[in-house]
């Protein structure tokens, strides 16, 4: 350490790092405090019921540009069902929250049409502080409902949560979102009211 009238400079230091406790690692053996690389192993090529070919992969920061055209194909009602309120601002600051994620704490999978590269849907999962449970959210283009895309996205995020060792995942769904509630029942989720909000 060097010190003079202009300040203090540390030129040499020793840092000790204690071993992680058992279970303190995320999926694939990554320590939870590590900056995880892009998880390419989660990329999938899938086919919808109508034979549309879809590329499903983890989201990346540069996917922000895909959100504008995507939101143009989502009705106001579907936006309300996803965000629980009308959404008007789709600017950089808003969309960046969805595309710039820490893979050690969260995951989002984006579905793109293989032929055009256009965004078709997205599913997200954010783990709690203890990395034991997570909350999911999903949004699919309104003109693509009924083709099985939502089902594929949900299966992907469920498989990811299992691989990470999460014990439980849950989502908040408005009580009038009957399609989403029905899909969650089919996927094996337990459905119940939110004691703090009668609309959920």
Where are these regions (language model features)?
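Long, contiguous binding/interaction regions
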Residues: 18-200
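Conserved metal-phosphate-binding beta-hairpin within the catalytic cores
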Residues: 1-15, 136
């Amino acid at each position: 350490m060097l010190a003079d009238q202009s300040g203090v400079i540390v030129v040499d230091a020793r840092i000790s790092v204690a071993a992680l406790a058992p279970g303190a690692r995320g999926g694939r053996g990554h320590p939870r405090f590590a900056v995880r690389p892009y998880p390419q192993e989660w990329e999938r090529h899938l086919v919808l019921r109508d034979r549309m070919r879809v590329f499903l992969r983890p989201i990346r920061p540069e996917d922000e540009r895909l959100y504008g055209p995507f939101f143009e194909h989502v009705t106001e009602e579907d936006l309300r069902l996803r965000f629980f309120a009308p959404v008007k601002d789709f600017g950089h600051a808003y969309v960046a929250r969805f595309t710039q994620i820490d893979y050690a704490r969260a995951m989002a999978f984006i579905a793109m049409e293989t032929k055009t590269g256009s965004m078709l849907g997205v599913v997200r999962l954010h783990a709690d502080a203890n990395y034991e449970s997570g909350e999911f959210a999903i949004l699919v283009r309104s003109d693509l409902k009924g083709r099985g895309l939502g089902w594929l996205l949900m299966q992907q995020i469920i498989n990811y949560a299992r691989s990470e060792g999460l014990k439980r995942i849950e989502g908040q769904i408005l009580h009038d979102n009957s399609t989403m509630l029905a899909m969650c029942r089919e996927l094996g989720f337990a459905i119940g009211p939110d004691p703090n909000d009668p609309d959920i």
